[in-house]
């Protein structure tokens, strides 16, 4: 994987998109199906030749690029996004230090890839299968991520499955962030550059 500003921006936008969808699903009970599918499909792309191949094209990350450039701020919505981002990246750091968990994750994703030949990725059972990977392997690694939203939606099992599947997609994005050389200093000192890059990409989406 190339270690460029472009690649870091794509990787970080992918995390932003997944956690933004978590927020939308928790608040509204649903979200755009195409964006959801692009997000969840990224989990199954395990041997890409370049960064953008994981998401198909830049347009599939439009929501993430918008979130990166406009919504990481001190507003209530922005603060919630930031909290999810910090939690997901902390979980990924725990995951990267656990070879056993990484092995289990790879095995479970291989099963999903085989199932994709027979089932639509957005089928309830497939989303449930992705959610169970998060619940079984990722969630035990660190403090539980507290997702806030409308209780009427969050009590629905289907919504819970979508949220967990999206958190798995967010962790996948955090793994990519590490693979393209993303470090904490890039978030502290290089965020302005990423925002500028995101705006350039949005202009051509």
Swiss-Prot record:
Primary location class: cytoplasm
Classification via InterPro entries: HflD, HflD-like_sf
Gene3D superfamilies: HflD-like (1.10.3890.10)
Pfam families according to UniProt: DUF489 (PF04356)
One term under GO cellular component: plasma membrane
Keywords, ordered alphabetically: Cell inner membrane, Cell membrane, Cytoplasm, Membrane
Membrane topology: Peripheral membrane protein
Compartments where located: Cytoplasm; Cell inner membrane
NCBIfam families reported for this sequence: PRK00218.1-2, PRK00218.1-4
Family (UniProt): Belongs to the HflD family.
Annotated protein name in UniProt: High frequency lysogenization protein HflD homolog
Organism: Photobacterium profundum (strain SS9)
Upper classification of the organism: Bacteria, Pseudomonadati, Pseudomonadota, Gammaproteobacteria, Vibrionales
Name of the gene: hflD
């Amino acid at each position: 994987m190339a270690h460029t500003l472009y690649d870091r921006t794509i990787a970080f936008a992918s995390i932003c998109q997944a956690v933004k969808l978590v927020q939308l699903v928790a608040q509204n009970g649903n979200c755009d199906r195409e964006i959801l599918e692009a997000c969840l499909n990224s989990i199954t792309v395990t041997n890409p030749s370049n960064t953008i191949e994981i998401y198909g094209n830049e347009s599939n990350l439009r929501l993430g690029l918008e979130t990166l450039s406009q919504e990481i701020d001190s507003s209530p919505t922005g603060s919630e996004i930031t909290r999810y981002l910090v939690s997901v990246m902390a979980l990924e750091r725990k995951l990267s230090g656990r070879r056993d968990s990484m092995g289990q994750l790879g095995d479970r994703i291989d099963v999903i890839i085989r199932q994709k030949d027979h089932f639509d990725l957005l089928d309830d059972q497939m989303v449930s299968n992705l959610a169970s990977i998060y619940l079984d392997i990722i969630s035990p690694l660190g403090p539980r991520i507290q997702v806030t939203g409308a209780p009427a939606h969050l009590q629905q099992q289907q919504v819970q499955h979508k949220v967990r599947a999206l958190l798995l997609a967010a962790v996948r994005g955090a793994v990519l962030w590490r693979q393209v050389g993303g470090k904490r200093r890039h978030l502290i000192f290089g965020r302005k550059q990423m925002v500028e890059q995101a705006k350039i990409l949005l202009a051509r989406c």
